[in-house]
Amino acid sequence: RQVLAFVQAHPGESGIVYCASRRKVEELARSLAAAGVRALPYHAGLEKSVRDANQDAFQQEDGVVMTATVAFGMGIDKPDVRFVCHADLPANVEAYYQEIGRAGRDGLPADTLTLYGLGDMQLRRLQIEQGDSSDERKRIERQRLGALLSLAEAPRCRRQT
C-alpha cells in the first residue's frame, strides 16, 4: 500500500521501484498494474526479449514505472525519472546512492522512498553471520549495514531542494 500511494503521488511520471527478489518484482508489477499504473517488471529471470522490450518502453515512454531488481539500471540514462522507491532495504549505502541517483538527472526535483522494517534488518544480519565469509569480511559487512541503517534513520533528507 505504501508503494502504491507513493507511485500514485506521481501520476504520469516515470519511476523505478527496486525490490530484493524476482518474486516481489512480479507481484508488485501486477498489483500496481491492477491499480491502473503502467508498471513493468525487470529482473534477470525474464527472457531477454521481455527485458529489452520493458527497458525500451521505460526509456521511450512517459509514465512508465519499472519494478526491478538491481539487474535494472546499468546503462539507463533517462533524465526525467521523477522517483525511486526501494520496496526493500538496499544492499548497502553505495548501491543506495547509485540507485537513487537515477532520479532527477534533468536537474528537476525528484523523490525517493525507502521502506524497510525490523525483519529486513534481522534477515540481513542473519545472512552476514551465516555466510561463508571470513570474520574480517563479516565485520566489514556489519559496518556497512550499520552505515546504511544510520542513513535510513537520519531525520533529514541527504539533499533537499
Go through each PLM region and give its residues.
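Helicase motor core with emphasis on the C-terminal RecA-like subdomain
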Residues: R1-D135, I140-Q143
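Cys/His-rich short segments
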Residues: I140-T161
